Amino acid sequence: MKIAIASFTRNGCAWNQKLCAALKKHSCEGYALEKYGKEAGIPAIAPSLPAWTERMFQKMDAILFIGACGIAVRSIAPYVKSKKTDPAVLCMDEQGKFVISLLSGHIGGANELTEEVAAVTGAVPVITTATAVSYTHLTLPTKA
């Protein structure tokens, strides 16, 4: 998967770098607000968050926002089209406590990526897709 990771705080930048290094089976690109990214050596989210999000929506398989869900939702809203074509979108708080599969969970791979990010960070994975949480996509054994 081609993954873009966006961070908005100093602590978010630390997670950004850790995740880019740890998710080795993927191709990760880290980005940050200029004032924090500059000191961490992470490219800036530029020229603006909306323009960056539009570009990432077109070229990446997944986007992970390290920050408030509100930032993620407002950033992706203009570009959401279809669960069949939209990239996976995740959101993780800057303390690394929770990672949320926000968009394209099942088809786009956000649920699986959420589990991978949680394994790296120790975060609680938050997955709300009905088939994932109720196991309705599995054939469960029945008692004889």
Language model: regions and residue ranges:
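N-terminal basic/disordered segments at the start of proteins
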Residues: M1-K35
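N-terminal beta-loop-helix "entrance" segment that forms/cooperates
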Residues: G30-E54
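Short coil/turn connectors at secondary-structure junctions
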Residues: M1-K2, H26, Q58-A62, K84-A88, ...
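General beta-strand structural signal in soluble alpha/beta enzymes
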Residues: E29-L33, L64-G67, C91-M92, P125-T129
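Conserved small/polar residues in nucleotide/adenosyl-binding loops
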Residues: T136-T142
